[in-house]
């Protein structure tokens, strides 16, 4: 969309933070209003993360107004809330391309702008990186400030507290801003509390505070009395005791939608030494009533008509794999009261809404705490229950040691329902489910299943749930199923594939939901087609049979080729000294950028046309 100068006259003056800082303070509320409207107009036309950005407009303006970015380093955690940041940092006219192939990256991305200090997408990384950046600035003698913005969800993760604990120990000069949008502006975020925040962050208070410490440092009883008095005064009006105990100077909570008040507080805090913590209260979806009322639904949106106040309904076609999982979960839980389901803050995305309502006492949302989720599941299994960890492929990476140490070594029957496996689409490099087969396949005695359709997905979930000799995993993609008939649940024989089509000379060994495209290729080339089903244990007998009866083999998977299912086939053939040629088709050795799933599969040669072209070129 072309930028409408008449509609956004103040925003038109700002194409960089240098231009922003030239504006008079009095014009900033108007700028915030225009920025919010522009965000609504652009995202509703292009799709993208929505409600979070609406809630951080004033904070973004205030930070770039007070701090000398990009010299001063501003780090956004996760990045859902960073659309206003992108608009104010030279990318205003491209915001309509966000999350699209070749367009702006969905999250802050170092390769895109000097203003994007840290490439993000996963949560709770900002404070750790910020400490490192602050330490380097201090060692180089640069008067460079470091600011980390983290949300109330991301700060619950253990990594954030590990970082704050370290910051309290080494005391770098840095500011952590907690964007708390868990609730609307509460009563204590009023004039009195804002005034108190400005007072506590001011130079007079800070000077008196530090001076008093020096004067009474040699008189321990008085020093301790003063410390307790200060904590008591703060504690009467602010909830910052935890952060103070971690070594931060806590200020807040303050109104995160008062841009002028934020500027005053940030200016006061800018020159304070040591780790500082500013707690702001915002409303997710601010300025667009439907998003304020339902921020979860409006967290990430497709293209929609803002005047309608609602998002377009799905066409009511085929169910998603997430729904297939959710339906199976409810069906199984109704028959077995030992079933326990765990998710790390992905209830909606993982298809667990209905389960959470029907079985609230067996549903555990552990927040953004993947490590805890896995070891919590281990504890449930030790106690005789049947835990299922529903998790995205990209987030299971964050709990790898727990899978190994707390589940697999102890042979605990934990089922991992791995959603968003393979190419996920618009979220790009940080969210592709490209590696789960590779990092799970090397774990001893792990059972790993790759369904080719929704019925097989259900059967594999059932099989994994009833497997009691150790952990198991079923991986399935983002998107809709293929429309096959759902048959009664039954356990599959572990480690056994099935031949779907008999052909000549060439055998295609397929792992997972690329099966429809692999079937087209097999038909075109008169090749044998095998649904391998199990990545671990592999059906070695079937692989050797295919090697003995065909001139060449092709493996197909939507996982990194390196270390993936195809690598396992290669290992079997080498171990048995079978010299048959093998072509491994899968994800290449680079991080896959954003684009629709269809666009990226076509570009990577993972659709039928691409596979056939690769095979023909290899055979030529």
From Swiss-Prot:
Example GO biological process: terpenoid biosynthetic process
Q: Which cofactor does it need?
A: Mg(2+); thiamine diphosphate
Q: Which PROSITE patterns match?
A: TRANSKETOLASE_1, TRANSKETOLASE_2
- Pathway it acts in? Metabolic intermediate biosynthesis; 1-deoxy-D-xylulose 5-phosphate biosynthesis; 1-deoxy-D-xylulose 5-phosphate from D-glyceraldehyde 3-phosphate and pyruvate: step 1/1
GO MF annotation list:
1-deoxy-D-xylulose-5-phosphate synthase activity; magnesium ion binding; thiamine pyrophosphate binding
Q: Which domain of life is it from?
A: Bacteria
Q: Which reaction does it catalyse?
A: D-glyceraldehyde 3-phosphate + pyruvate + H(+) = 1-deoxy-D-xylulose 5-phosphate + CO2
Return the similarity comment: Belongs to the transketolase family. DXPS subfamily.
Q: What is this protein called?
A: 1-deoxy-D-xylulose-5-phosphate synthase
Per the UniProt record, the source organism is Shigella sonnei (strain Ss046)
High-level lineage: Bacteria, Pseudomonadati, Pseudomonadota, Gammaproteobacteria, Enterobacterales
